Amino acid sequence: GTLTNIVKGFTADGAVILEPTSLKVCPIQSGALTFRLTIPGRATHAAMRWDGVSAIEKYSLIHQSILEFEKERHQLFNVQYYESKRRVAPINIGTIKGGEWHSTVPESVVAEGRFGVFPGESAKDAREEFENHIRQKSKSDEWLKDNPPIVEWFEGQFESGQTDTRHPIIQSLSECYFQSTGDKSIIEGVTYGSD
């Protein structure tokens, strides 16, 4: 919708984008970046498991570190207008595919996920931080330091964004909300990349 109107040449002083906000005024949003992680292993028959390297076990190390990394990132940023300061830029693994056969040590795991970008943080900086985290974590593992995971960025790459709460469009929306409900509007940030 929004992008189509811009491409067609429509302009405006402001825009109201309809997202499921429960009628909250949401002038600030986190960004969201889609990524793919490929974790290498070394395949061998399960009867000789000790001669192989399970990509699933190596992925488990990386996954646990991503959960800790998410917590660390939330301690570094101080962003107003969110329901919880610990839930501004979530990192989520949405799909995992690994192994070819039940009796083979898995040679690779491919995990795809979504990396949250804090308001005020550029997508470029967020990507670099994530890639650096994966690189540093890999250096602490005997296998991964020589066979590091591959990070790819694809599909949705949404920057964070915000509109000053004193901006006339925010003030107008808040006033309309008050006139309609008799209540003061709730200003709240959203944790997703909106168009």
Where are these regions (language model features)?
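Metal-dependent amide/peptide-bond hydrolase catalytic core
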Residues: R36-D195
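Acidic/histidine-rich catalytic neighborhood of metal-dependent amide-processing enzymes
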Residues: G1-T34
